[in-house]
Amino acid sequence: VETKPISTLRRWSLLSIALFATLFSNVFINGVAFLIPTLHRDFGLDLALAGLISAMPKFGMVPTLIPWGYVVDRAGERFVLWLGSALTAAAALAAAISIGKGSHSLVLTGGLLFLGGMAAASSNSASGRLVVGWFPAEQRGLAMGIRQTAQPLGVGLGALVMPQLADSHGMGAALMFPAAVCALAAVVCAVAVIDPPRPPRAEAPPEDLANPYRGSQILWRIHAVSVLLVVPQALVWTFALVWMMSEHGWSPASAGVLVTVTQILGALGRIAAGRWSDKMGARLRPIRIIAAAAAASMLLLAFTDLIDSAWSIAVLIAASVVTVSDNGLAFTAIAEIAGPFWSGRALGAQNTSQLLMTGLTPPVFGALIGVAGYPVAFAVCALFPMLAIPLVPADRDSANLMGTNRGSPGQPV
């Protein structure tokens, strides 16, 4: 199928749009976690219940990630990006209004955060497909690494802005911030996004249309590995701010700045991991190495926190970087293996499994912290990346699957 070529500048501009649309969605999805101190102080919630409220956007994403992926496979990236961003903005605005009515509105606010998560799920598959579709294989690791910085940068932006808005103007004002930036993303996506080329379904070879989950365990194993590796990431992101404030006496502003710095470093780590995978010509071997490093960093964090060492802050920074570095590699591998007619659903399945675990992590570990303390929680968390190490498939297996069963996502045939 012939398609009008785009310039290198246009390709990178599309990457920028995909990055910022996903970044702003992540401000909404992850920013509520930085309102846990406000929920505790102003509404009297304990850590477990505040963690549950903060996880509502993530729970909302779980039932819609695969359906959004199906819509992307059928209707294209542009439609999904602008519609999902607009709906996320509307839900965030409604939540901001509802929370102003006081503690009796927390159930309504939680429901609206859940609905916003359902809408925000749209950006994950759509932006990933947009990047994979417009970049050649030898640049995909780097490009997807850049796109995957949306999550840590979104977390960092949320940590920088939302706690201070909540402290000075209340939780409603804090929720207005993701409403505004997601509305901006909706307009930009509607105007500027170009869907990548792919062959019509009627002209596609049978192997491109075949279900990539049948006859192979590769995608299932990548999903399982990613679920295990997201636990330390979610733990560090959710409780870093409150840990620094309650255990080390940091102010909300100072703790927010440090969290933002760690997220920027994490974003750079994702880019470096993507470039590393391009140079190696492998996506999965680096994931195995990162899993080992994540386990080591969480164990060291547990030990330094147990002995009340000042080095625990530095170890937290290192853990924040290591635990996010694998995401782009798994995302790229899944899109390449699944092909142009299944990558939306495969990426949706990837995010569904990850975000279900991400949603469970705050309340479960919040309860564990309340009972046993932070060092025990950090040590238990280290078990998850340990379990992931032997599950990572060999790169030769995924290469064989791509070579025999899949076309290149988004590329004309």
Language-model-detected regions and their locations in the chain:
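Residue-level signature of mid-helix packing/kink "hotspots" within the transmembrane helices
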Residues: 30, 58-66, 155-156, 263-267, ...
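Cytoplasmic helix-loop-helix junction between adjacent transmembrane helices
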Residues: 112-151
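Extracytoplasmic gate region of multi-pass secondary transporters
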Residues: 32-36, 218-263, 267
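Helix-to-loop junctions at the C-terminal end of transmembrane segments
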Residues: 64-76, 270-282, 369
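C-terminal ends and interior cores of transmembrane alpha-helices
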Residues: 86-102, 292-306
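C-terminal transmembrane helical hairpin of 12-TM major facilitator-type secondary transporters
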Residues: 283-330
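Helix-loop-helix hairpin linking two adjacent transmembrane segments in secondary transporters
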Residues: 147-194
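Cytoplasmic membrane-interface "Motif A"-like loop-to-helix N-cap segments
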Residues: 74-85, 279-292
